[in-house]
């Protein structure tokens, strides 16, 4: 790619239906890249496993190759607005430097922005993946459906991320590390976290946490289902525990109940501080909503005065319906972070087509 059209140049024709952006969703498990048009949505996308064994530079090489392929495919028909990248945090901005990311071992201090820009030969836009998921959910998902201007989001995947939109603007904090909801304390002296602390929400409500808690429960109870799972697949994952829960395993269901309790404790602090009308839970683990949400809501009622007063389902509430507290699964599903990365690279005045699939 010899030269890229900048967002400022594209903004001169901001209603141009031929504008497109390329978004990157860099995760600890998967690397996804998409070309996006404001008038047509996702034009094309590609996904691959994140090869952590190749190191940060190796992952960036794969990322850049996928980005260039999509640019070459669509640049003859569309004007490129820019490239947006979402990455696990903590992410220091504006430097684009990653600090001790729990889900990207060996990446501490890696200059992600600089490495990508050197390889592509152009500036990029970069933000934490959870912030971008929140922004997409605000622009294209529940934020648009409910016509609200603020929301808080937790992403439940390999780890637990957080994002915050206030008064229509993505709020990233003083240096990009705002809304690190995965590191809210839920259990004093709890499980050690990759951030260096103990008892963080991420250690009880992420995919890695579900697998760990299932192993701990196996030692406690010797559950037949969990025992058979361990025998057939010693390195079982959260997906395996989820499948077992769907098959009726009481102990597998107990793992998700414990996850819900931890989420309720963490959300209680967030709700008490922010007092927003919408909190969104996204990421792969949301498929287990019915397994963890009842315990989550019960814990919230116990621990959050604000939630008890403003809960959407509270009978005889004096709070107007539009201002009541909703906690809902994300509307955009696993595409939220990728869509957010695409939106990040567009001129902010550019209108976008609502997500419709």
Predicted regions and their residues:
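A short acidic/small-residue loop/turn micro-motif
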Residues: 49-51, 106-107, 178-180
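A charged helix-plus-loop insertion that forms the helical arch/lid used to bind
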Residues: 96-107
